[in-house]
UniProtKB/Swiss-Prot annotation:
Reaction equation(s) it catalyzes: L-tyrosyl-[protein] + ATP = O-phospho-L-tyrosyl-[protein] + ADP + H(+)
Taxonomic source organism: Rattus norvegicus
Segments on the Extracellular side according to the record's topology features: 22-376
Protein name: Fibroblast growth factor receptor 1
Binding residues for ATP: L484, G485, E486, G487, C488, F489, G490, K514, E562, Y563, A564, N568, R627, D641
Protein's membrane topology: Single-pass type I membrane protein
Amino acid sequence: MWGWRGLLFWAVLVTATLCTARPAPTLPEQAQPWGVPVEVESLLVHPGDLLQLRCRLRDDVQSINWLRDGVQLAESNRTRITGEEVEVRDSIPADSGLYACVTNSPSGSDTTYFSVNVSDALPSSEDDDDDDDSSSEEKETDNTKPNRRPVAPYWTSPEKMEKKLHAVPAAKTVKFKCPSSGTPSPTLRWLKNGKEFKPDHRIGGYKVRYATWSIIMDSVVPSDKGNYTCIVENEYGSINHTYQLDVVERSPHRPILQAGLPANKTVALGSNVEFMCKVYSDPQPHIQWLKHIEVNGSKIGPDNLPYDQILKTAGVNTTDKEMEVLHLRNVSFEDAGEYTCLAGNSIGLSHHSAWLTVLEALEERPAVMTSPLYLEIIIYCTGAFLISCMVGSVIIYKMKSGTKKSDFHSQMAVHKLAKSIPLRRQVTVSADSSASMNSGVLLVRPSRLSSSGTPMLAGVSEYELPEDPRWELPRDRLVLGKPLGEGCFGQVVLAEAIGLDKDKPNRVTKVAVKMLKSDATEKDLSDLISEMEMMKMIGKHKNIINLLGACTQDGPLYVIVEYASKGNLREYLQARRPPGLEYCYNPSHNPEEQLSSKDLVSCAYQVARGMEYLASKKCIHRDLAARNVLVTEDNVMKIADFGLARDIHHIDYYKKTTNGRLPVKWMAPEALFDRIYTHQSDVWSFGVLLWEIFTLGGSPNPGVPVEELFKLLKEGHRMDKPSNCTNELYMMMRDCWNAVPSQRPTFKQLVEDLDRIVALTSNQEYLDLSMPLDQDSPSFPDTRSSTCSSGEDSVFSHEPFPEEPCLPRHPTQLANGGLNRR
């Protein structure tokens, strides 16, 4: 009996030993789960939940193996394996994968598959087709399960958030996403530039889709630029992510091709040729390369269009950089001919052509001067010549600049004024002031420019000015108010002047007062005096900013001028764009009245009248633009900053010999390239101002680099007709932009033409701005503002004028009102 039991004991022991020593079974190739499984059980588990997997077993199972993604599953502090069951505590997204339970028995092996996804994210990351109703609903997550543990917020798809800078064209839709999760379900809020972002902070608002952790902004505009931060938080933590948005303005032009490209080529037979075509365009251009060919001996077809062969066209994955270059390999005589780069967009087409000439290959001849000795001699001679030229140029420049230097104490305060006012220290004045007034040099009376209550200007010594009874206003009759702005050396404040009109000594008038800043220099003081004296000399006119008075005695210099309550013309027009098409930076602002065509023509007419008067006084403005035209409470146009112009009483042009900061988008070619300023160059600027008026404050040639603008002007490029401008007015602009200055109209002729057009234009002829101005006209305002006389627009030459003063503009104070003919 005991022998039988002993034998049975040893049999069981041997069997158990063999089973234990058997190596872990591997899946047969045909049963590998990484092929196409027959049956897979899918499980979605939330982070922090308990993951339980149970394998179905047969009665005769001898061994069980667990694998995840083809790798043996091992136990850990969170993972427990008990035969046919696997438990994973506090599951995390890294626990996701394809689990396999492999069982072995005498009858064969069997595999059970489990597809596990540990995530709170939705099955699809896209929400393009989500209902808009989801924008007001919080993301619903089952956080009430008893086995859920608290989890701080975390990103569920960080790889989709790697792109932080998003540059998009205006009018596009922008969507930012911050897919995340946590327990309990976290909240989502958005900041713009570090401050709370609310729907009423932008025109059109925005949508937040909590189900997909996203924010959507339709029809973005330049004011939407900034940093957008999503903050995801619950009681156990907080995370944030910042996106940067840059909105690019659209250029209302057909493609612009760089001058001189493609260039003509002359090559030898068998050479390689490369044609280059540089294209500037927004919207996206379509580029093609064509070769002109002959058909039956003719280059022109029956439709009067040239025969051509398409050599290269843009594909789905072809970039603009690739399309801008045409490569020809191993050219033959048949390759000679005319090649054209054709670029088009939704606005129009542009093309440039070049010729390829193929010559016989030249026989190589031994070079005569290729030895190192000859090359060394050439290099030394060339270097010596260049150095000599540089030294000579410096010497000549020094000699010329030395002869042109003038002492500050004797410089004139205005340009060739009838009476000059030199600034002097400690001057002696004759007892008979009238004698000195008639002597041709007006001496300065002892009167400090700094009062006892105001510190002396940092860069200005103690100077004295004469009192002019015609313009002098006692300081106690001037009440200074709030600042209106400041510029390069001065500032402007709103003030109330009492008794400007001698006949009404108690009448209070709102005025603007120009004064120096505390860090002004002697040069700045001279410029302010120069402007004041120029305004005295020019006199008064309804359509210019007039001098009203000055405070020159016993304190700082105050220059009192007319106050224009509605700001400059550019901002005035932008504020009155029709609803839905303007891009106003004040979301609460809505225009109350739409401008008519007659209003716009009246603007141009009044500016032309003001310029006609300045021209009659032999003054050249040099910086005529909508930003330098101010609008009064009664909608009267007044030209500003003409006091900075040069007097040309004895010569009919003004040539600037030193480089400076120039408003190149408004400048005539002769002023831009030769620094020659005339009344005709002001007429060119008036043409650009007309274009600004009929685009309601648009920015000329936006986004065009300075060097490209130079080339475009030399090639005869002119801006296109605004959408709501008549052909007659556009032809007036083109006449103002004539390349030959003498062929441009005079301001007198412009006044006569505009007077006639105003009379013929109906008051009810309102602008139809329902056309797509966001693509075809500059209805996007230039966000940059000007504080200097030359302005701060997108195309400028960036060296400051050494002798051009720079006073601030009046800030815009928007008010509605139609324009009447003045």
